[in-house]
Regions:
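Catalytic-core regions of hydrolytic enzymes
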Residues: 1-105, 109
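Conserved beta-strand segments of alpha/beta enzyme cores
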Residues: 43, 90, 114-117, 132
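Short, well-ordered coil↔helix boundary/capping segments
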Residues: 97, 112, 153-157
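Glycine-rich, flexible loop/turn motifs
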Residues: 11, 52, 87-89, 114, ...
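Solvent-exposed amphipathic alpha-helical surface segments
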Residues: 40, 110, 114, 170-174
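Active-site-adjacent mobile loop/cap segments within catalytic or ligand-binding domains
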Residues: 66, 73-80, 117-176
């Protein structure tokens, strides 16, 4: 399984309330997802494990070169600072949507967030990965409710557990 923490290094991603940077929210969530999966005996690779920049192509090249079974890109959303009312999770797919549906269901079941659904999108990392892939938007750094949650380490662990639970469920149903 390749876990792809969005942005990093020179690319902070979205910047939200109080200067909250997407890259700094996403990395601890991604590291915790990785830890949980590894505890279950799952081979996990990260596209980045600290604060450095990786190109979009570099992210999917890694997954394609190692012939990964799954690619999970983790991001935080933004709507512009003029819209602090916009909050919630979204999960994206390009081809097969089963992985996205499974992760989405696990998040909605276990994390107190507005549900903005599962959507199809032509994001580069989804189009160019050769395995089932998903992009999870864990909340809005520009959303008043979400930003407070995303900055909280306990919430980050809760979100990571939900994402990892979805990945494990998908593997058990489709890859074993």
């Amino acid at each position: 399984v390749v876990i792809d923490p969005g942005h990093g290094g020179k690319d902070p991603g979205a910047i939200g309330i109080g200067g909250l940077q997407e890259k700094n929210v996403i990395l601890p969530i991604s590291l915790e997802v990785t830890r949980i999966l590894q505890q279950q005996g799952i081979d996990v690779r990260l596209t980045r494990d600290s604060d450095f920049f990786v190109t979009l192509q570099g992210r999917t090249d890694l997954a394609n070169q190692i012939d990964a079974d799954l690619f999970v890109s983790i991001h935080a959303n933004s709507m512009g600072k003029a819209r602090p009312d916009v909050n919630g999770i979204e999960v994206y797919y390009f081809g097969d949507r089963r992985l996205s549906d499974t992760i989405h269901r696990n998040i909605v079941r276990s994390v107190d967030m507005r549900d903005r659904g599962v959507r199809r999108a032509r994001f580069y990392v989804l189009r160019t990965s050769k395995m089932p892939s998903t992009l999870v938007e864990v909340g809005f750094v520009t959303g008043a409710e979400d930003a407070a949650k995303l900055a909280n380490a306990n919430f980050q662990r809760q979100m990571a557990a939900a994402i990892a639970g979805g990945i494990i469920e998908y593997i058990q149903r489709n890859l074993r």
